[in-house]
Amino acid sequence: METPRRVEHQQTDRGYVPVYTTGIVEQPWDTYTAEDHRTWATLFERQQALLVERAAPEFMAAVADLRMSAAQIPKFSELNALMERATGWRLVGVEGLLPELVFFDHLANRRFPVTWWIRRPEQVDYIAEPDLFHDLFGHVPLLMNPLFADYMQAYGKGGVKASGIGPEALMNLTRLYWYTVEFGLISTPKGLRIYGSGIVSSKGESIYCLESAAPNRIGFDLERVMRTKYRIDTFQKSYFVIDGFQDLIRATEPDFTPIYERLKEAAAIPAGDVLPSDRVFHRGTGEGWSNEGDV
């Protein structure tokens, strides 16, 4: 079998430029090197140790249910057998970042795209784009949770619809994904815990999001989140807290079309702002924030 391409962002004098791909590929598991498996083991062991008292219990339970371990990079085929029985989801291999509409269509059909290649050893602490570890360890476990699995499918269907409405609707929806799927927190009887994939796959942000005084931690509100800018190059200025995964299901039940119309008239909210109407878990000090770069 020919090894699929490794499609990575391109570094320019203006930063990283995204490079998109569209095809589905078979996971070339037999081509992973010993170094690839060591990189997986390093990342897996580090995050497992960090997340014991930081991640949502549903996430930790799902990692165990999927039989993920440091021993080797998991095989998509073995994970699919477990996921399809649990929630009807399956993984599809991809070479890199997908265009929005292609990505939405996969989610709408309970397929989660996973980048087949893993970062290099020198990228263990940071990589500009999603790799196998981010996708597989960060995103896949919660697809075993029925509520979160339903939310992801509903999000995909909403994305397909928003693609036909216009760029403003897509931006609103992108912010929802960013502040829930990628960087969401959940309130538990033991305190705030992490469920967002961008956090659970990151050593630094796993600590920062819960323990630093700098960021805001604000109760989840759908339209507030859809108006809020975010950061792609640093840790977040604000994190939004759900009370349970049912909050996400309730958020996606209504037709978003009138919401998009309302939000056209509402100004975007800077990433670090706290509003008088916010339910504030913690008002951040703003230490170390950049005044530029919100998107």
Question: Language-model features: where?
Answer:
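A contiguous, surface-oriented mixed alpha/beta subdomain in the mid-to-C-terminal portion of proteins
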Residues: E122-A251
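The feature captures two recurrent sequence modes
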Residues: M1-L143, V225, K237-V295
